[in-house]
Amino acid sequence: VALDPNTGGIQGLIGRRGEYTFRGFNCAISMQRSPGATIKPISVYAPALEAGYKPDSILKDEPQSYYEAKNFDGTYQGEVPMYEAVAQSLNLPAVWLLNEIGLNKGFNKAKEFGLPLTEADKYYGLALGGLEHGTSPAVMASAYGIFANGGTLYSPHLITKIIDSTGAVIVDKTQPKGKRVISKETSEEMTSMLLGTFSNGTGMSADPYNYTIAGKTGTTESSFDTTKSNDQWMIAY
């Protein structure tokens, strides 16, 4: 999915692989999947910044008694600055920080970002993308558009305007109304950390030559073999 973060207008999408099927299932819009670690900036780091944390705030990187989680390589450092936890997509600091700011704060902020959460999602798995029903690529793209445009949510849409044969306007999204979700300062601080994903983090191998991009990677483990993944996400701007 490619969309304009300043309007929510979808510029392009691939709905499925293989031959075109008329009115076939569109994975980009209708598929509900766990977003993996791409949820961390939404449910943990953005609300933490809003609560007064800074990119260089020190986070605990160690096992916790209230939720069983581990980092992707099975190691931990004890303490790490937030910007490193974001770039390296560390799981333990994300869970610890969600506990520090409070489940309600992370849950409510993620809903403000447009994620279709239910009460069943209000647990520590929210820090790692473990959702009851999941979300779609289109919703996640619009959520990251909030970081790209300075803090405002614009709902993703495919149609800009419809005028019927009588000249009546049926749909008009030429000037869509956005909703403020985070402050401009928070969006800028989040972007500064998401740049690290491609400069020295989990997205280094995907860093495009001669372009500067910010974003986040995400992987969901297979329930049958934890060494393999079901989905691999990349969201960038």
Language-model features: where?
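Active-site SXXK
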Residues: 8, 34-59, 85, 143-147, ...
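Short, well-structured active-site flanking segments
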Residues: 25, 39, 48-67, 101-107, ...
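Conserved catalytic neighborhood of penicillin-recognizing serine enzymes
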Residues: 53-106, 167-196
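A penicillin-recognizing enzyme superfamily signal
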Residues: 1-4, 13-14, 20-29, 136-142, ...
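Extracytoplasmic/periplasmic, Sec-exported soluble proteins
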Residues: 2, 30-39, 51, 74-78, ...
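Mid-domain, small-residue-enriched loop/turn segments at the edges of structured enzyme/sensor domains
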Residues: 70-71, 102-142
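Glycine-rich, acidic and aromatic/proline-enriched surface loops and short helix-turn segments
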Residues: 2-19, 50-53, 78, 87-91, ...
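Flexible loop/turn segments at secondary-structure boundaries
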Residues: 9-11, 18-21, 66-67, 93-94, ...
